[in-house]
Amino acid sequence: MQLPISQYNELLQKKLEKLTALLRPFNAPDIQVFDSPTSHYRMRAEFRIWHEQDDFYHIMFDQATLQRYRVDEFPIASTQINRMMQTLLPLLKQQEVLHKKLFQIDYLSTLSNKIIVSLLYHKTLTEEWESAAKNLKDLLEKQGFNVQIIGRASKQKICFEQDYVDEVLPVNGRNYVYRQVENSFTQPNATVNCKMLEWAIDCTQNSEGDLLELYCGNGNFSIALAQNFRKVLATEIAKPSVAAAQFNIAENKVDNLQIIRMSAEEFTQAMNGVRAFNRLKGIDLKSYECNTIFVDPPRAGLDPDTVKLVQNYDRILYISCNPHTLCDNLVELSKTHRIEKAALFDQFPYTDHMESGVWLIRK
């Protein structure tokens, strides 16, 4: 697999032109552009495993034709994932219990040189598999990998030490530690993620009052942004992400950030006094003066009720993975707010996907 590296700047310019055109109706200022490394930028990857007689190998599917194709190296992924791909398969081939009915391998790597390998099977994992997997982990560690092996099957998950890695991200000269849990969302392009965090910190400098973040994940943004606010209140619904966020808050010595496990809808009910929640015992919502809100919604964008919710805040920091739904939301948001800053983050080079950000101030 070869990447069109010589065309990188041209492709990025086309994305900029497209985003500029989309934001033009909203009187956006000049868009800041944050580029990506041209190869080995993706920190996670998933591959199906194709078995052919006595052989097996990684495959992917062509999005246009749906035809499978063999993948022996993957220059999009980190150098660590590539090295693991080439080291792992020969070791799996040595033990039938490790490769029989293996149908998928997921890799999660970090800038801090740690990696999780998840092996997915169409069979029950036995003590024999556990013994072989422990031996596999030892062999990989002898080859210099800081690795966690996880086995997954129907209603089964086996891990030997931990199901997470601790990433270290350099942001504005400071290192932030983020616990990343296997099978949970993490930003795929770590280098661009650092640039996103730096841009968000820059936008919110000199902020007054408190910050509210909806669906904070492992605290990726709220932990870095806490330095700019008196207090930060963040919501997240997934238990593993909440646990990771709590660890990250302590590890990064952030003392003004509170995570609550509830949905955006539940939070709105609590703020409006519609109903009480046991999860909020000990948290005085009235003590927060949140005049800034941060949102990073899924590709579908914000639903109409959440758009109305965020319009109540003087300042809105909106990170989007879909510029079309961002613009749909801006139709309403631009009635009350103006775009102060706009950015393009090239999280996904060589694709049409665009990550963007807007910093909105009440008119």
From Swiss-Prot:
InterPro entries assigned to the protein according to its UniProt record, in alphabetical order: MeTrfase_TrmA_AS (IPR030390), MeTrfase_TrmA_CS (IPR030391), SAM-dependent_MTases_sf (IPR029063), TrmA_MeTrfase (IPR011869), U5_MeTrfase_fam (IPR010280)
Disulfide-bonded cysteines: none
Domain of life: Bacteria
Recorded catalytic activity of this chain's protein: uridine(54) in tRNA + S-adenosyl-L-methionine = 5-methyluridine(54) in tRNA + S-adenosyl-L-homocysteine + H(+); uridine(341) in tmRNA + S-adenosyl-L-methionine = 5-methyluridine(341) in tmRNA + S-adenosyl-L-homocysteine + H(+)
One term under GO cellular component: cytosol
First-tier enzyme category under EC: transferase
PROSITE patterns listed in its UniProt record: SAM_MT_RNA_M5U, TRMA_1, TRMA_2
EC number of this enzyme: 2.1.1.-, 2.1.1.35
One of the protein's GO biological processes: tRNA methylation
GO molecular function, one term: tRNA (uracil(54)-C5)-methyltransferase activity, S-adenosyl methionine-dependent
Active site: C321, E355
KW ATP-binding (keyword) present: no
Record's keyword terms, sorted: Methyltransferase, S-adenosyl-L-methionine, Transferase, tRNA processing
Residues the entry annotates as binding S-adenosyl-L-methionine: Q187, Y215, N220, E236, D296
Function of the molecule: Dual-specificity methyltransferase that catalyzes the formation of 5-methyluridine at position 54 (m5U54) in all tRNAs, and that of position 341 (m5U341) in tmRNA (transfer-mRNA).
Family matches, as PANTHER family: TRNA/TMRNA (URACIL-C(5))-METHYLTRANSFERASE, TRNA_TMRNA (URACIL-C(5))-METHYLTRANSFERASE
Family statement drawn from the similarity comment of this UniProt entry: Belongs to the class I-like SAM-binding methyltransferase superfamily. RNA M5U methyltransferase family. TrmA subfamily.
NCBIfam families assigned to the protein according to its UniProt record, in alphabetical order: trmA_only (TIGR02143)
Full protein name: tRNA/tmRNA (uracil-C(5))-methyltransferase
Species: Haemophilus influenzae (strain PittEE)
